[in-house]
A protein has these predicted regions:
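AMP-forming adenylation/ATP pyrophosphatase catalytic core
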Residues: 1-148
């Protein structure tokens, strides 16, 4: 059999990232969120934390009355990265990480009620969160990978 014609067909598939509906932030609580970017999220006080299967755990410190959200990125969003003195523009981070332009607007971010970015799923965590618990950390963000 000749190898000619063996590679004539190309199949492309496009999958939704799970865009947050509209521009309204979705509040994260102790219950699991819907799936965004292949993961689901929950935020709870450290005292209520139980290890979840197939999950990344991010510890951080925030006021006890804080609220947390998942939303699409907004113009001017900045994230403080580990090892940096100044926050980096999220738009620049997405360029540096080679995120395709059509995906950038719908990429979810995890924020506090003061619009501080904690995590850009699949890209980078903020310097405010750590996978190791530190003194004073009173909140836990759990990122569970969706098993399809």
């Amino acid at each position: 059999m000749s190898p000619q014609g063996q590679y004539d067909t190309v199949f492309l598939n496009r999958q939704s990232l799970g865009k947050v509906a509209g521009t309204d932030p979705v509040r994260l609580t102790g219950d699991w969120s819907q799936v965004y970017c292949g993961c689901r999220y929950r935020v709870l006080p450290f005292t209520q934390f139980e290890q979840a299967e197939d999950a990344a755990v991010w510890h951080f410190c925030a006021p006890e009355d804080s609220r947390f959200f998942v939303r699409n990125r907004k113009p001017g969003d900045r994230i403080l990265l580990a090892g940096m003195d100044q926050p980096k523009k999220l738009a620049r981070l997405m360029i540096d990480e080679k995120i395709p332009v059509p995906m950038r607007e719908s990429w979810p971010v995890i924020t506090t009620d003061k619009n501080e970015l904690l995590l850009v799923p699949g890209i980078r965590p903020s310097a405010k969160v750590s996978q190791q618990r530190c003194d004073g950390d009173n909140w836990v963000l759990i990122e569970q990978f969706n098993r399809m």
